[in-house]
């Protein structure tokens, strides 16, 4: 274990650059007083001309003083009237204080993200766009593998928040900051039981989403660091990580060579893995997806590792049923709005040899990516474009807009969904979604003009709605060089347009 000691040491630079909230003293209350300011504070901190983005608490404090001076109406003397500040609504002020605490704690991680993007020479404003024939963790030749085990691991979620707070002790060495952190947690949770009820932690995550995301990401970062360390020791090839951000609130960038490991003594026997593992790891919506071409015995060892990781390292009793194992040829993988599978299709070939004829059954594998119809109908129904059965309905909240604005809104949603799901191998579900949006747009316009959809379509003409049925053009990203996208490669694979910044329009519309 001596030669791996460098992986077991903490990265001291993170501790030195950590911005302790108590350094700002009364200025944290200034941020908390203006609740709307917390949404744009990071843009204010990082977009001021004249400041170089270095992890310096002096620069951040000067910026906070500058904001404090721009709002003269904020007069808060925390030394003279501490009780009066909390006398009106204790829960409300503790909530906005926790959000201000989270904003300041996010600063070093945002700086770390900017530095990692600069090292990779990627434009930070376009880092959420990517194009690939299939998802990056499915880019290997899956069709040539005999068995493709996939483990869908449910990450422990309903855990005691004290465990989340203790995770910060490796990063924050200041006792006062940890005491302040625990004070926020005491406002919402009951500390008598080791495992919190689902309602308590759900309430905390809803009231303080930013604060909870920081604690939860600390928890997951430590969990993943152990897994990456063991995976590197079991493979001859060093794993390469990629920054794939589904939401801006997940501010962790998985950069290469950024491994921080804290191994329990019970895991030393796990290091006996010596086979060259072919493994990929993806985290998405509280689940970790692991797939490999390993044998069943080796995958069972990884399952044994995960169960013991939860029990001995996080003090969380984990049921074996929380880890699902399946093969892509038998059960599809639900990931990022796609159902990916590798079905085995048979084709009969008739061969004639002299007087005898033979029928040869050839089994072929092909990676298929389908769009699930039920979640799509549920999303459209939630946004009031159709009912629960998928029948299109009008959008009453848009009836006050102009005709061109209504058509543009529906077209924007239709194009975003069409581009995002253009990588599907079967377009039947995508065509049905376009049909629902087209009729919903027609019903909305008819509702505005107080007529029926059929009469309005005759008056307006069907040419207006041809955009809904027009085939999407291939969109190329500017991140990749021209050498990476040769004309031959464009025709061999399906091109996916994955624009994370705009695919959530359907969910966010009211």
Curated annotation (Swiss-Prot):
GO MF term list: RNA binding
Keyword terms, alphabetized: Chloroplast, mRNA processing, Plastid, RNA-binding, tRNA processing
Location(s), subcellular: Plastid, Chloroplast
Main location, first listed in the record: plastid
Source species, domain of life: Eukaryota
Pfam families given in the database record: Intron_maturas2 (PF01348), MatK_N (PF01824)
Endpoints of the signal sequence: none
Keyword DNA damage recorded: no
GO BP terms: mRNA processing; RNA splicing; tRNA processing
InterPro entries: Domain_X (IPR024937), Maturase_MatK (IPR002866), Maturase_MatK_N (IPR024942)
GO cellular component: chloroplast
Protein family (similarity comment): Belongs to the intron maturase 2 family. MatK subfamily.
Job description of the protein: Usually encoded in the trnK tRNA gene intron. Probably assists in splicing its own and other chloroplast group II introns.
Record protein name field: Maturase K
Species: Memecylon elaeagni
Gene: matK
